[in-house]
Protein backbone atom coordinates (compact mmCIF):
# COMPACT_ATOMS: atom_id res chain seq x y z
CA UNK A 1 0.00 0.00 0.00
CA UNK A 2 1.26 3.53 -0.75
CA UNK A 3 2.28 5.63 2.24
CA UNK A 4 -0.38 8.00 3.53
CA UNK A 5 0.46 11.64 2.85
CA UNK A 6 -0.42 13.87 5.79
CA UNK A 7 -2.37 17.06 5.13
CA UNK A 8 -0.91 19.96 7.16
CA UNK A 9 -3.28 21.53 9.65
CA UNK A 10 -3.76 25.16 10.67
CA UNK A 11 -4.64 24.14 14.23
CA UNK A 12 -1.43 25.58 15.71
CA UNK A 13 -2.01 28.93 14.05
CA UNK A 14 -5.65 29.07 15.16
CA UNK A 15 -4.69 28.30 18.76
CA UNK A 16 -2.00 30.98 18.76
CA UNK A 17 -4.40 33.57 17.34
CA UNK A 18 -6.83 32.80 20.15
CA UNK A 19 -3.94 33.58 22.52
CA UNK A 20 -3.44 36.98 20.88
CA UNK A 21 -0.62 36.30 18.44
CA UNK A 22 -1.16 37.79 14.97
CA UNK A 23 2.01 37.58 12.87
CA UNK A 24 2.82 33.88 13.06
CA UNK A 25 5.77 32.76 10.95
CA UNK A 26 6.49 29.23 9.81
CA UNK A 27 10.14 28.26 9.32
CA UNK A 28 11.82 25.35 7.59
CA UNK A 29 15.05 24.52 5.75
CA UNK A 30 16.14 22.76 2.59
CA UNK A 31 19.46 21.16 1.76
CA UNK A 32 20.56 20.15 5.22
CA UNK A 33 21.85 16.75 4.10
CA UNK A 34 23.31 17.73 0.74
CA UNK A 35 26.93 17.26 -0.32
CA UNK A 36 27.05 20.54 -2.23
CA UNK A 37 25.65 24.04 -2.03
CA UNK A 38 24.08 26.02 0.80
CA UNK A 39 21.50 25.20 3.39
CA UNK A 40 18.52 27.47 2.70
CA UNK A 41 15.73 28.49 5.08
CA UNK A 42 12.32 29.91 4.36
CA UNK A 43 10.15 32.01 6.68
CA UNK A 44 6.51 32.71 5.81
CA UNK A 45 3.69 34.60 7.50
CA UNK A 46 0.37 33.55 5.96
CA UNK A 47 -2.91 35.42 6.51
CA UNK A 48 -5.60 33.65 8.58
CA UNK A 49 -8.08 33.41 5.71
CA UNK A 50 -7.04 31.87 2.43
CA UNK A 51 -9.10 30.84 -0.58
CA UNK A 52 -8.39 28.71 -3.61
CA UNK A 53 -7.85 25.09 -4.52
CA UNK A 54 -4.10 25.50 -3.99
CA UNK A 55 -4.57 25.83 -0.21
CA UNK A 56 -5.63 22.19 0.10
CA UNK A 57 -2.65 21.12 -2.04
CA UNK A 58 0.00 22.40 0.38
CA UNK A 59 2.16 19.60 1.74
CA UNK A 60 5.67 19.02 3.04
CA UNK A 61 7.85 19.98 0.06
CA UNK A 62 9.56 16.57 0.10
CA UNK A 63 6.39 14.77 -1.04
CA UNK A 64 5.59 17.19 -3.88
CA UNK A 65 6.75 17.04 -7.49
CA UNK A 66 8.99 19.90 -8.72
CA UNK A 67 6.14 21.22 -10.89
CA UNK A 68 3.68 21.24 -7.99
CA UNK A 69 6.24 22.93 -5.70
CA UNK A 70 6.71 25.71 -8.26
CA UNK A 71 2.93 26.10 -8.62
CA UNK A 72 2.41 26.32 -4.87
CA UNK A 73 5.43 28.60 -4.39
CA UNK A 74 3.87 31.19 -6.71
CA UNK A 75 0.61 31.15 -4.73
CA UNK A 76 2.36 31.21 -1.35
CA UNK A 77 4.61 34.19 -2.06
CA UNK A 78 1.77 36.14 -3.71
CA UNK A 79 -0.63 35.54 -0.80
CA UNK A 80 1.83 35.74 2.11
CA UNK A 81 1.81 38.74 4.44
CA UNK A 82 5.58 38.50 3.97
CA UNK A 83 8.18 35.85 3.27
CA UNK A 84 11.94 35.68 3.74
CA UNK A 85 14.83 33.49 2.65
CA UNK A 86 18.20 32.87 4.29
CA UNK A 87 21.19 30.90 2.98
CA UNK A 88 24.45 29.71 4.53
CA UNK A 89 27.07 28.51 2.07
CA UNK A 90 29.16 25.33 2.13
CA UNK A 91 32.25 27.03 3.56
CA UNK A 92 30.30 28.30 6.56
CA UNK A 93 28.70 24.87 6.96
CA UNK A 94 32.14 23.23 7.03
CA UNK A 95 33.36 25.83 9.52
CA UNK A 96 30.49 25.85 12.02
CA UNK A 97 28.65 22.56 11.44
CA UNK A 98 25.30 21.92 9.82
CA UNK A 99 23.09 22.46 12.91
CA UNK A 100 24.43 25.97 13.71
CA UNK A 101 24.42 26.77 9.98
CA UNK A 102 20.77 25.76 9.72
CA UNK A 103 19.85 27.96 12.68
CA UNK A 104 21.79 30.85 11.12
CA UNK A 105 19.92 30.44 7.82
CA UNK A 106 16.63 30.50 9.73
CA UNK A 107 17.68 33.64 11.57
CA UNK A 108 18.53 35.26 8.23
CA UNK A 109 15.13 34.25 6.85
CA UNK A 110 13.35 35.87 9.79
CA UNK A 111 15.45 39.01 9.36
CA UNK A 112 14.48 39.04 5.66
CA UNK A 113 10.78 39.42 6.53
CA UNK A 114 9.37 42.90 6.01
CA UNK A 115 7.65 42.82 9.41
CA UNK A 116 8.69 41.14 12.63
CA UNK A 117 6.64 38.09 13.60
CA UNK A 118 5.34 37.76 17.13
CA UNK A 119 5.56 33.95 17.14
CA UNK A 120 7.64 31.34 15.29
CA UNK A 121 6.54 27.83 14.35
CA UNK A 122 9.73 25.96 13.49
CA UNK A 123 10.27 22.56 11.95
CA UNK A 124 11.92 20.53 14.71
CA UNK A 125 14.50 23.09 15.89
CA UNK A 126 14.59 25.67 18.64
CA UNK A 127 16.24 28.99 17.80
CA UNK A 128 17.82 30.46 20.95
CA UNK A 129 19.46 33.30 18.98
CA UNK A 130 16.05 34.68 18.00
CA UNK A 131 14.41 36.41 21.00
CA UNK A 132 10.84 35.66 19.97
CA UNK A 133 8.21 33.25 21.33
CA UNK A 134 8.50 30.03 19.37
CA UNK A 135 7.66 26.35 19.17
CA UNK A 136 9.64 23.58 17.53
CA UNK A 137 7.41 20.89 16.04
CA UNK A 138 8.69 17.44 15.13
CA UNK A 139 7.66 16.73 11.52
CA UNK A 140 6.33 20.26 11.43
CA UNK A 141 6.64 20.46 7.66
CA UNK A 142 4.12 17.62 7.38
CA UNK A 143 1.82 18.66 10.24
CA UNK A 144 1.68 22.48 10.30
CA UNK A 145 0.42 24.61 7.40
CA UNK A 146 2.75 27.58 7.94
CA UNK A 147 5.81 25.34 8.23
CA UNK A 148 4.75 23.41 5.11
CA UNK A 149 4.53 26.72 3.23
CA UNK A 150 7.99 27.65 4.50
CA UNK A 151 9.33 24.27 3.37
CA UNK A 152 8.10 24.96 -0.16
CA UNK A 153 9.64 28.45 -0.20
CA UNK A 154 12.96 27.07 1.06
CA UNK A 155 13.01 24.14 -1.37
CA UNK A 156 12.09 26.10 -4.48
CA UNK A 157 14.53 28.90 -3.59
CA UNK A 158 17.34 26.40 -3.12
CA UNK A 159 16.50 24.38 -6.24
CA UNK A 160 16.62 27.55 -8.35
CA UNK A 161 19.98 28.44 -6.85
CA UNK A 162 21.37 24.97 -7.54
CA UNK A 163 20.24 25.22 -11.16
CA UNK A 164 22.27 28.43 -11.46
CA UNK A 165 25.28 26.76 -9.84
CA UNK A 166 24.92 23.94 -12.36
CA UNK A 167 25.91 26.42 -15.08
CA UNK A 168 28.91 27.61 -13.05
CA UNK A 169 30.08 24.08 -12.26
CA UNK A 170 29.15 21.94 -15.29
CA UNK A 171 29.57 18.20 -15.23
CA UNK A 172 28.22 17.62 -11.73
CA UNK A 173 24.56 17.66 -12.85
CA UNK A 174 23.61 19.89 -9.92
CA UNK A 175 20.34 20.91 -11.59
CA UNK A 176 19.30 17.26 -11.59
CA UNK A 177 20.11 16.11 -8.05
CA UNK A 178 20.35 19.55 -6.37
CA UNK A 179 23.50 18.57 -4.48
CA UNK A 180 22.12 15.50 -2.72
CA UNK A 181 24.32 12.43 -2.41
CA UNK A 182 22.88 10.42 -5.28
CA UNK A 183 24.88 7.73 -7.05
CA UNK A 184 25.23 10.05 -10.05
CA UNK A 185 26.55 12.89 -7.89
CA UNK A 186 29.11 10.70 -6.12
CA UNK A 187 30.23 9.29 -9.47
CA UNK A 188 30.72 12.83 -10.83
CA UNK A 189 32.78 13.78 -7.77
CA UNK A 190 34.97 10.71 -8.24
CA UNK A 191 35.52 11.65 -11.89
CA UNK A 192 35.88 15.45 -11.61
CA UNK A 193 37.03 15.94 -8.03
CA UNK A 194 35.62 18.12 -5.27
CA UNK A 195 34.45 21.57 -6.41
CA UNK A 196 34.54 24.86 -4.46
CA UNK A 197 30.86 24.44 -3.53
CA UNK A 198 31.16 20.95 -2.01
CA UNK A 199 30.93 20.38 1.75
CA UNK A 200 34.31 18.93 2.61
CA UNK A 201 33.35 17.83 6.13
CA UNK A 202 30.49 15.63 4.89
CA UNK A 203 30.86 11.91 4.22
CA UNK A 204 31.91 10.56 1.76
CA UNK A 205 33.81 13.72 0.77
CA UNK A 206 35.75 13.88 4.03
CA UNK A 207 36.89 10.30 3.47
CA UNK A 208 38.03 11.17 -0.04
CA UNK A 209 40.06 14.11 1.26
CA UNK A 210 41.52 12.13 4.16
CA UNK A 211 42.53 9.41 1.72
CA UNK A 212 44.60 11.75 -0.45
UniProtKB/Swiss-Prot annotation:
Manganese or magnesium. Binds 1 divalent metal ion per monomer in the absence of substrate. May bind a second metal ion after substrate binding. Gene3D superfamilies: Ribonuclease H-like superfamily/Ribonuclease H. SUPFAM superfamilies: Ribonuclease H-like (SSF53098). Its cofactor is Mn(2+); Mg(2+). GO terms for cellular component: cytoplasm; ribonuclease H2 complex. One of its GO terms (molecular function) is RNA binding. Keywords: Cytoplasm, Endonuclease, Hydrolase, Manganese, Metal-binding, Nuclease. Its EC number is 3.1.26.4. It catalyses: Endonucleolytic cleavage to 5'-phosphomonoester. It is found in: Cytoplasm. It is an enzyme of class 3 (hydrolase). GO terms for biological process: DNA replication, removal of RNA primer; mismatch repair. Residues 22-212 form the RNase H type-2 domain. InterPro entries: RNase_HII, RNase_HII/HIII, RNase_HII/HIII_dom, RNaseH-like_sf, RNaseH_sf. Coiled coil: none annotated. A divalent metal cation binds at residues 28-29, 123. The keyword Metal-binding applies. It comes from the Bacteria. Endonuclease that specifically degrades the RNA of RNA-DNA hybrids. PANTHER family: RIBONUCLEASE H2 SUBUNIT A (PTHR10954), RIBONUCLEASE HII (PTHR10954:SF18). This is Ribonuclease HII. The lineage of its organism: Bacteria, Bacillati, Chloroflexota, Dehalococcoidia, Dehalococcoidales.
Amino acid sequence: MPATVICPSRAEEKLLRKQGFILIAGLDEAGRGCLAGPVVAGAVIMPPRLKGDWVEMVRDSKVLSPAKREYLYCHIVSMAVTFGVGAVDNEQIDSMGIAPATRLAMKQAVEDLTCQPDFLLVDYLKLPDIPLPQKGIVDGDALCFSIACASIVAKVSRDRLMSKLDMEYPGYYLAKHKGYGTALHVECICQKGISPIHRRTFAPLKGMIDGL
